[in-house]
Amino acid sequence: MKHLSKAAQYTLQFINQTNKSVFLTGKAGTGKTTLLKEIIATSHKNTVVVAPTGIAALNAGGVTIHSMFQLPFAAFIPDYKVVNSNSYQYKFETKSTISKHFRMNGTKKQVLVNLELLIIDE
C-alpha cells in the first residue's frame, strides 16, 4: 500500500468492508487520485470505473458512463406527455423510447450483475 493518510486508509478500509456509498471530494493535490488508484489496485470487490467524458475515463482507467450503461446521447424527459421528440431539432428520450437502448450482450450483463463497486470519477 502506498503512503496514505490515516483518513485515506480508513476510507479504503470502509469501502472494502461495507456496502455503503462514499462521496470523495477535495481540493487539487489532496490525494483523491492517489486514493482512487489505491482503491482500484487493492479492492477485492468487482469494480468498474466510469467517467462522464472520454478523456476523464481514459485518465481514470475506465469507460464513459454512457458506454458502460448504453445510455443514448439525448436528453431524458420522464413525462412522455410533455414533449414529442419528433417535433424538436434536438433528440429527446422518453420512458417509451429509452428502453430500445438497453439491449446488452451477455458479457456486459454479467459485469453489471456481479458489480460490487462502481467508481464514478469526474
Predicted features by range, described:
Residues M1-E122:
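Conserved ATP-binding/catalytic motifs of P-loop helicase motor domains
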